[in-house]
Every structure is written in structure tokens, then in C-alpha cells.
């Protein structure tokens, strides 16, 4: 494996595994005694419970059925939309539950922290742990540990197919794809912060429906864009698919930044108009 691939893997590992908690720590240190860490953890649970504990196990069970496999192969567009919509719906339930938990002391900063927790824990679990595994695999390849593991597995009568397949996948993946995984996490974390902000602002203003629907629409759109990769080999080249995906995801991320800035201004204006209790005589 060339040095560029190794650097790309390390950069994505840093972005997905180290940046989320590090950024939260810096944010919490800048805004002490404002419940940043508790909001981050609540936001993280808003992803972990509905997605990791509920939706993904359901999808894993369905993926073992012939009917589901056949449907995904013959109805790619509907399948991609269904994955995007259910991801948005399940995570919306987590975002709403998080916002309700924070409602008694729901500030813009805590809402942002919840969004960072939601996107951060997703980055850690979905990408960070996978790339940590890649790094361990690389170390094994460089030190001879991989060959020793294969030899031991073979001597014990085990199947080494999975090990060899993992090695081939790691060695033959273009370096740009490793780097794009980190870039995608940066985009996704920004979008998750904005989507959680939409829900939190809806709870804050007691106008839940329009803001949660906006969140659902945005999440479905973002994940449906990612499903374009399902069409690779079906009239769409890998290069073209990834170009379309990342151009569109970047556009959605720009929109997410606009959302964050707009809600920040509105929230600040509302807080400025509030009259402190201790000033009332």
C-alpha cells in the first residue's frame, strides 16, 4: 500500500474518531457550566438508540430474506428512497426525544451540542471504528502479523477467506475513496448539527410539526443522495456517481450552515427580548 493511501486512512480516522469528542471538549471549555457535555450525550443517544439498537438490526434481519434481497436489486430507486426515509424517520424520533429531554434548559448552544453529539457518535461508530480496524490491519500487514494469523487459522482448520478478502479490499481501494470517507463525515456532521437544530428550535418555539418535517425532508434528501452509489454498474460509473454525490452533499451542507446561522440569529433575537425575572419589581 502506498503512502498516500496510508495518510488518507489516518486523516479519515482522525476526522471520524478523534475530531467529534475533541471538538465537543473545546466547545464545552469555551462555554463552561452551560450543560454542553450533557446535551452532547443526549444528542448521541438520539442517534444510538433508534439507529444502532433498532433500525440497523431490523435491516440486518431483512437483508437475510430472499424477498428483501430481490426487491433491493430490482427496485433500486424505491429501495434507496426507503433506506433514506426510514433513516430520517428513526433518527428524527431520536432528535425529538433529545430535544424534549433538554426542553427545560434548551439554549442555542445546547441545541448545537446535541446536534454535534448526534453526528459525532455516528461518525465514531459508522466510520471511526471501521478505520481503526483498517489501521490495525495495516499494522498487521507491515509487521507480519497478518501472515501469522492466516497461518494459525489455516493450521487450526479455519476458513481464511474473510481475512484474504479484507486484505484485498484494503489494498485495492483507491486512496481517494479513503479520503472521501473523511470528507463525507465532515459534511454529515455539519448537516446533523443543522437537522437537530431544526427539531430543537421547533420544540423551543412550540412549533414542532413544521420544523420536524423540515428535518425529515432534509435528512431524506441527504441520504437519498448517498444512495446514488447503488446505481454504480447500472449505467453509472463509479467516478460519475461519486462526483454527483459529493457535489450535491456539499450543496446540502452549505444549506445546513445557512440554517445554523439563521436559527442562531432568530434565537438570539428572541433571548434579547426576554425580560429577566430579577429585573421585575
Predicted feature descriptions by range:
Residues 1-281:
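Hydrophobic alpha-helical segments at protein termini of multi-pass membrane proteins
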Amino acid at each position: 500500500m502506498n503512502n498516500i493511501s496510508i495518510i488518507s486512512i489516518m486523516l479519515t480516522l482522525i476526522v471520524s474518531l478523534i475530531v467529534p469528542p475533541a471538538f465537543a471538549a473545546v466547545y464545552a471549555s469555551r462555554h463552561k457550566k452551560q450543560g454542553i457535555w450533557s446535551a452532547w450525550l443526549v444528542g448521541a443517544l438520539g442517534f444510538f438508540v433508534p439507529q444502532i439498537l433498532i433500525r440497523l438490526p431490523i435491516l440486518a434481519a431483512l437483508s437475510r430474506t430472499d424477498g428483501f434481497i430481490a426487491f433491493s436489486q430490482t427496485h433500486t430507486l424505491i429501495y434507496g428512497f426507503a433506506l433514506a426515509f426510514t433513516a430520517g424517520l428513526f433518527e428524527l424520533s431520536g432528535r425529538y426525544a433529545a430535544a424534549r429531554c433538554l426542553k427545560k434548559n434548551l439554549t442555542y448552544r445546547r441545541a448545537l451540542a446535541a446536534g454535534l453529539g448526534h453526528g459525532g457518535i455516528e461518525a465514531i461508530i459508522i466510520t471511526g471504528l471501521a478505520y481503526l480496524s483498517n489501521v490495525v490491519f495495516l499494522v498487521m500487514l507491515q509487521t507480519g502479523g497478518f501472515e501469522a494469523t492466516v497461518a494459525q487459522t489455516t493450521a487450526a482448520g479455519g476458513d481464511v477467506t474473510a481475512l484474504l478478502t479484507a486484505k484485498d479490499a484494503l489494498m485495492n481501494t483507491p486512496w481517494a475513496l479513503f479520503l472521501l470517507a473523511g470528507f463525507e463525515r465532515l459534511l454529515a456532521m455539519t448537516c446533523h448539527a443543522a437537522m437537530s437544530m431544526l427539531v430543537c428550535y421547533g420544540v423551543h418555539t412550540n412549533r414542532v410539526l413544521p420544523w420536524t418535517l423540515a428535518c425529515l425532508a432534509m435528512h431524506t434528501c441527504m441520504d437519498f443522495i448517498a444512495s446514488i452509489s447503488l446505481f454504480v454498474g447500472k449505467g453509472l460509473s463509479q467516478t460519475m456517481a461519486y462526483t454527483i454525490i459529493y457535489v450535491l452533499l456539499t450543496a446540502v451542507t452549505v444549506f445546513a450552515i445557512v440554517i445554523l446561522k439563521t436559527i442562531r440569529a432568530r434565537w438570539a433575537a428572541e433571548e434579547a427580548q426576554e425580560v429577566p425575572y430579577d429585573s421585575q419589581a
